[in-house]
Amino acid sequence: MSSGAEKIVSSIMSEAQAKADAIIREAEDEAAGIVDEGEKRARMASERILESARKQADMRYQQIISEAKMNARRAELEAREEVIQEAFKKAEEELKNLASTSQEEYVSALRGMIKEAAVEIGGGDLVVSMREDDRSLDLGLDKIAAEVEAETGKKTTLKVGDSIRTIGGAVVRTEDGLIEVNNTIEARMSRFRKALRSEVARVLFE
């Protein structure tokens, strides 16, 4: 091969090599870019997954804390309710004992309950029902009737009716049975339970 031909071949090969090198560099750069982009996307995806996991963990933590507080509050309320119910039970037992052992004090209280019920009805001809043990007590019904009449301005009579099952107190009704006031100890406890509950809770827990 002549020197001229060799130069031409050498020039062509040099140019081809340069183009090949350029293509290889471009391919390497593109590949590096793809790898970088892939790593970037992988990091972003990983961060999103981690953030989502953190949020879910925090939500679950808050839920557990909330449930624990709610359960603790429920347990506290149940314990308070148990103590209050026990206090009411004890009070009822003490009232029952009062009705059976402290004659003078109970008779005075019973007179007051009969008068209160009679005044609430508005006086008139009234029937007083009590437990069997109380029907024979000297309650002074005529005197109570006079006091009711003085307060209501209506002529009043009180007579003993049938016996009832109660721990104490009385049920007072008109003779025709149209109006009745239950002033037994149980009924009074039931009526005043809401107000008493607040007072009992204040005394027990404050």
Curated annotation (Swiss-Prot):
Pfam families for the chain: vATP-synt_E
Top-level lineage group: Archaea
SUPFAM superfamilies attached to this UniProt entry: F1F0 ATP synthase subunit B, membrane domain, V-type ATPase subunit E-like
Protein keywords: ATP synthesis, Cell membrane, Hydrogen ion transport, Ion transport, Membrane, Transport
GO cellular component annotations of the record: plasma membrane; proton-transporting two-sector ATPase complex, catalytic domain
Molecular function per GO: ATP binding; proton-transporting ATP synthase activity, rotational mechanism; proton-transporting ATPase activity, rotational mechanism
One example of a Gene Ontology biological process annotation: proton motive force-driven plasma membrane ATP synthesis
InterPro entries per record: ATP_synth_B-like_membr_sf, ATPase_E_C, ATPase_V1_Esu
Intracellular or extracellular location(s): Cell membrane
UniProt main location, coarse: membrane
Membrane topology annotation: Peripheral membrane protein
Keyword Cytoplasm on entry: no
Quaternary structure and interacting proteins, as annotated: Has multiple subunits with at least A(3), B(3), C, D, E, F, H, I and proteolipid K(x).
Function (record text): Component of the A-type ATP synthase that produces ATP from ADP in the presence of a proton gradient across the membrane.
Family per similarity comment: Belongs to the V-ATPase E subunit family.
UniProt protein name: A-type ATP synthase subunit E
Organism the protein comes from: Methanothermobacter thermautotrophicus (strain ATCC 29096 / DSM 1053 / JCM 10044 / NBRC 100330 / Delta H) (Methanobacterium thermoautotrophicum)
Gene name in the database record: atpE
